């Protein structure tokens, strides 16, 4: 495996323009884009940054929702928050930034496709947020987050009801039963776990969801079942 190359000056300038921040410490940006599989001269990768970025993103999105939806209850705010900090949303932001052109990985990771590669793109976005926060402070990080999340926060599908609640009401009405959730698998490191959860409703095919928390994975599984059964309109690909 060859050593990963640092960003060229031209690529760094282009990416900083998309981010809206010129890094005082350029190494922070390089590290935020470096997967653990990549061999670099200094040996750094984005794992620790990802841990911090997840928290910064959650704080800024929670504040955005609190200020934007003044009459929403805790349940609705939680649903919106889970949608906006999900791997799918973070990966969509990564695609908007064309981060796949800049992520440094080993050869084995370059072969990943689908959900696993989506998770890599999502992780890099969180790492990037941490790098911005460390380099420019909370206000700069908040400005970046608002730039790419504010529009998503007010989309119509953000008001969708809690999937688990909706599925429970539907399954009670149709089958007289309560959905059953079980954790099938927990994988990944402690700082970035993945939970695979299956939801079962007696009489129909089960569905599974994979996310960074048990609760979020349950929501994904419930959403998939609601969409499959025609209760909810299926989200367009890429959203």
UniProtKB/Swiss-Prot annotation:
GO cellular component: cytoplasm
Binding-site positions, Mg(2+): 50, 123, 126
Domain DRBM per the UniProt entry, residue ranges: 162-231
Entry's Gene Ontology BP terms: mRNA processing; regulation of gene expression; rRNA processing; tRNA processing
Catalytic activity: Endonucleolytic cleavage to 5'-phosphomonoester
Molecular-function annotations in GO: double-stranded RNA binding; metal ion binding; ribonuclease III activity; rRNA binding
Function of the molecule: Digests double-stranded RNA. Involved in the processing of primary rRNA transcript to yield the immediate precursors to the large and small rRNAs (23S and 16S). Processes some mRNAs, and tRNAs when they are encoded in the rRNA operon. Processes pre-crRNA and tracrRNA of type II CRISPR loci if present in the organism.
Full protein name: Ribonuclease 3
Species: Rhizobium johnstonii (strain DSM 114642 / LMG 32736 / 3841)
């Amino acid at each position: 495996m060859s050593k990963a190359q640092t960003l060229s000056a031209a690529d760094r300038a282009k990416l900083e323009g998309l981010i809206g921040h010129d890094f005082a410490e350029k190494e922070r940006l390089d590290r935020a884009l470096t997967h653990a599989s990549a061999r670099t001269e200094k040996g750094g990768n984005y794992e620790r940054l990802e841990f911090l970025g997840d928290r910064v993103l959650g704080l800024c999105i929670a504040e955005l929702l609190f200020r934007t939806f003044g009459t929403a209850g805790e349940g609705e705010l939680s649903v919106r928050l889970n949608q906006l900090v999900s791997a799918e949303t973070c990966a969509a932001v990564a695609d908007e930034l064309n981060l796949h052109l800049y992520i440094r990985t080993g050869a084995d990771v370059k072969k990943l496709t689908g959900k696993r590669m989506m998770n890599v793109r999502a992780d890099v976005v969180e790492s990037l947020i941490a790098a911005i926060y460390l380099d420019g402070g909370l206000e700069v990080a908040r400005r970046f987050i608002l730039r790419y999340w504010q529009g998503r926060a007010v989309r119509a599908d953000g008001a969708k009801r809690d999937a688990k609640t909706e599925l429970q009401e539907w399954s009670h009405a149709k089958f007289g039963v309560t959905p059953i959730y079980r954790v099938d698998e927990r994988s990944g490191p402690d700082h970035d776990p993945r939970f695979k959860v299956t939801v079962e409703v007696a009489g129909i095919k089960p569905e599974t969801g994979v996310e960074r928390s048990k609760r979020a994975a349950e929501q994904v599984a419930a959403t998939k079942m609601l969409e499959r059964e025609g209760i909810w309109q299926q989200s367009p690909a890429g959203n």
